[in-house]
Amino acid sequence: MAGGEDRGDGEPVSVVTVRVQYLEDTDPFACANFPEPRRAPTCSLDGALPLGAQIPAVHRLLGAPLKLEDCALQVSPSGYYLDTELSLEEQREMLEGFYEEISKGRKPTLILRTQLSVRVNAILEKLYSSSGPELRRSLFSLKQIFQEDKDLVPEFVHSEGLSCLIRVGAAADHNYQSYILRALGQLMLFVDGMLGVVAHSDTIQWLYTLCASLSRLVVKTALKLLLVFVEYSENNAPLFIRAVNSVASTTGAPPWANLVSILEEKNGADPELLVYTVTLINKTLAALPDQDSFYDVTDALEQQGMEALVQRHLGTAGTDVDLRTQLVLYENALKLEDGDIEEAPGAGGRRERRKPSSEEGKRSRRSLEGGGCPARAPEPGPTGPASPVGPTSSTGPALLTGPASSPVGPPSGLQASVNLFPTISVAPSADTSSERSIYKARFLENVAAAETEKQVALAQGRAETLAGAMPNEAGGHPDARQLWDSPETAPAARTPQSPAPCVLLRAQRSLAPEPKEPLIPASPKAEPIWELPTRAPRLSIGDLDFSDLGEDEDQDMLNVESVEAGKDIPAPSPPLPLLSGVPPPPPLPPPPPIKGPFPPPPPLPLAAPLPHSVPDSSALPTKRKTVKLFWRELKLAGGHGVSASRFGPCATLWASLDPVSVDTARLEHLFESRAKEVLPSKKAGEGRRTMTTVLDPKRSNAINIGLTTLPPVHVIKAALLNFDEFAVSKDGIEKLLTMMPTEEERQKIEEAQLANPDIPLGPAENFLMTLASIGGLAARLQLWAFKLDYDSMEREIAEPLFDLKVGMEQLVQNATFRCILATLLAVGNFLNGSQSSGFELSYLEKVSEVKDTVRRQSLLHHLCSLVLQTRPESSDLYSEIPALTRCAKVDFEQLTENLGQLERRSRAAEESLRSLAKHELAPALRARLTHFLDQCARRVAMLRIVHRRVCNRFHAFLLYLGYTPQAAREVRIMQFCHTLREFALEYRTCRERVLQQQQKQATYRERNKTRGRMITETEKFSGVAGEAPSNPSVPVAVSSGPGRGDADSHASMKSLLTSRPEDTTHNRRSRGMVQSSSPIMPTVGPSTASPEEPPGSSLPSDTSDEIMDLLVQSVTKSSPRALAARERKRSRGNRKSLRRTLKSGLGDDLVQALGLSKGPGLEV
């Protein structure tokens, strides 16, 4: 054993020492190999590392001739395949025997071998590509391969192995088909294989098709497998019928024709085949749940002469006893379902056929005529028809309470009040209700109706006013293109129904300076358009709604906290008025009155420790030294009476967290403080790479390069004069701003042109002179650039602010985030031995860095596990805070600068417009520009209000999270959002891994329920061992001796059926040893092989063949009691079998005329 292991108390071990061997199974059909080397060497495995990372070392140690990428580890002798993606500790639940060996001081053995999927693919490739003797040997070995590795069976089924067997068997002769049926029988003996056959309908169809084979051995084996399949579960009978009908529709033959041909004995007489066939039919009929399915099967058989076949075999003197029993059973089941007999022979009890009543017939006809579903009509019991009171009483309350229970709600919130009246009027009053309650309800209806009419009228009037005031603004402001296209001085373009000009004029006249603080520095050049209106409109920028930002958020709560904190410093204890709930006195200078719906956040968070952060016991017990969490503890002091905040019902987030109990003993063990390894210090990053800059580029080349992407010079001049944005794009305007001619360049070009008037100017010089000829060029370009940039600049500012506002709401309302904080706080309080009320969220960056000292798993991994245990319905957190994750990519300090730049550019655009007024400017163009700049000024002012209120809300949000005002001032929005984003991303990744691990464990538990389990261990076949026949047909290997009694025979039979044929995983044998190592047992029943069968078809049977024969024998020998007709569902009460309809449903004279009367030779 390596150091660090603990065998005494079963605690996790970090390093385990095992013995390792390899098994050369690259060729899955090579059955003569043994694990090598015979003396297994020892190897130390790290229990905390994934096994996939440790397999190369094991591979090198053993020198295994296997491909490294195809290797897997198998535990010996249990045969469990380890998951290479997980560590040993993560698979501890599935390795109880493995760790039990370690606890006893032993060294378990691991086998390095080929993965199951690789071996199965090799088997399928060999079967598909082989032919002749090689295919014959492969099919012969397939059964033994399934016997030796029980984990290979489900992998073979899941890898389309059944389809491979069917495809190979369809193109092979009967000898190959016999080998395939032997392998398929071995598969079906396992529960996993049987479930795979149940889910693969093609296998059942192929088995039914083989019933028509010319080889008796193939037919007999196929019938055996079908018998076991139908007997395994009652749900398999409909699957078998569906397969029969599918084959019949494909081949064009009648259903059940293959079984009827066996009963007709076209290929010779074989009593065993007849017994199996009739038993299969009886077992299928006995498992059918409804009468229609029963009659569909029997009618198809009767149409092919089943009655004549039954009578012929019953009339023969030498008919086998088992065959006679099954035939009589078929006849009695048919007669019992038709109601011709009242008691099943041998059933031991009387069973009356359910007679269809007249009420049931009427009800069925009514449902057929009315198009109703017959399944909803109550079926009568065995004693008589159902009472009609049930439907009447059940539909009565539904009709009364239906409209009231599911009203159709109106889309608008105002019209939702009308919903009250159907609830009042439709709700039925009780029989004992008085007349006074009726009058009271009517009075309430009248009052509510009057109030609703009043509100609807007011709403309609308000809606008309709003619709007339803002016809082109849907809850926000039009974009720059709409403002540009709708100038104020173009009244002819407006419709006479739109009073928007008057509303805008009144709004502009009502502009007044903000009483709190000016938005821009006071200057004599400031225009009135920068002043805010007294009654500000709804805060919305484009499609972003900021209307929930109230005027109370114009004041920064950090300033309020500072003033109130200063007042509280001299006092040794919180003042009594604050404890009684009275709000604190206003600070100096007095701020504007708070008008918002929520009170401001408290000046200082509550000081009382939270109950959920205290450990379970009142006094902390003495414990071992644990790893400490170096978080910054929140000092929640003060006893303010404010009990609610804008973000929740409590003053702080920590006060609203639910208590979380953690396993302190497990945490104490996992995070026990140990010698810390010296981690190498991180190397300092290299210095910044010096940037190479190119100075003094040639002006001419730069202009010529720019001209390649610009329109011709004359087009540029016309576009600049008319502000034609279709001729010059936004990129073109930016290039023109960099290519504007300077005064010095213009003078040099003019002097050169005067000196040489005959020589034309070059392209660059001509371009600069053309631009210089445009009056107010710089003003035009700046105004035009502002017009094109405004929408994008406004959205770049508004969208992050909106995301921040929504992100705070998402985080506060997120239940997963609260659970994470509560769990982490409880864990940290235990590890630190403290009673902290909370911690700064900046510690979330370090949660993934803390690791336990046992398994070296991060604290985040344990946190995910605890959260999933506490709240399995919790989310991954990352997908629920998308707004904050987007905010993590935005520099809000730069956003503030961009907002200031937008204001400055807006003022500069106004100055440019004033300077352009000196030049020639069309009146319509000037009106459009003036209208556009006025609207931009209003929107910039509104954007400034939104920015201020969102930032103040973020400060209040930090106070709600427990930050002090001093700490909140140091928090940057981008850094805060980045911390939450990175933590949420790591939490999602770790949570997915934990869920994947839990899913693998659950899959293992489900897989272990059927892993290697035989169908003889299921409830259906559990009585087979107790029904061992005490006749001379008992196998020789089962009987202990000629003088033994029934008790010994029963014990040996039970041990044979319940024992697995090959329980050892790695005890591989050569093919020459198969016959000698397996008990040779004769087949049950007649074993005389037909002369046309080849010598290789009579194969020696082993234990699995004997088990299959005993299962079939138990099915055929079952008593009539188990096959008594069951009470089936009836969709039509008067349906009879085809035989009874043809004979009993006609008149006596017509029956005699058709020659259908019963003769003496047809009596059963």
Swiss-Prot record:
The modification Phosphothreonine is found at residues 495, 690. Residues 355-368 have a biased composition (Basic and acidic residues). Keywords: Actin-binding, Cell projection, Coiled coil, Cytoplasm, Cytoskeleton, Phosphoprotein. Residues 1073-1089 have a biased composition (Polar residues). The modification Phosphoserine is found at residues 367, 486, 498, 523, 573. Ubiquitous. Highly expressed in spleen. Residues 1053-1133 form the DAD domain. InterPro entries: ARM-like, ARM-type_fold, FH2_Formin, FH2_Formin_sf, FH3_FHOD1-3-like, FHOD1_GBD_N, GBD/FH3_dom. Phosphorylated by ROCK1. One of its GO terms (cellular component) is bleb. Residues 612-807 are annotated as: Interaction with ROCK1. Residues 1127-1142 have a biased composition (Basic residues). The keyword Ion transport does not apply. It comes from the Eukaryota. It is found in: Cytoplasm; Cytoplasm, Cytoskeleton; Cell projection, Bleb. Residues 616-1013 form the FH2 domain. One of its GO terms (molecular function) is actin filament binding. Its main location: cytoplasm. One of its GO terms (biological process) is nuclear migration. Required for the assembly of F-actin structures, such as stress fibers. Depends on the Rho-ROCK cascade for its activity. Contributes to the coordination of microtubules with actin fibers and plays a role in cell elongation. Acts synergistically with ROCK1 to promote SRC-dependent non-apoptotic plasma membrane blebbing. Self-associates via the FH2 domain. Binds to F-actin via its N-terminus. Binds to the cytoplasmic domain of CD21 via its C-terminus. Interacts with ROCK1 in a Src-dependent manner. Belongs to the formin homology family. The DAD domain regulates activation via by an autoinhibitory interaction with the GBD/FH3 domain. This autoinhibition is released upon competitive binding of an activated GTPase. The release of DAD allows the FH2 domain to then nucleate and elongate nonbranched actin filaments. PANTHER family: FH1_FH2 DOMAIN-CONTAINING PROTEIN 1, FORMIN HOMOLOGY 2 DOMAIN CONTAINING, ISOFORM I. This is FH1/FH2 domain-containing protein 1. It comes from Homo sapiens (Human). The gene is FHOD1.
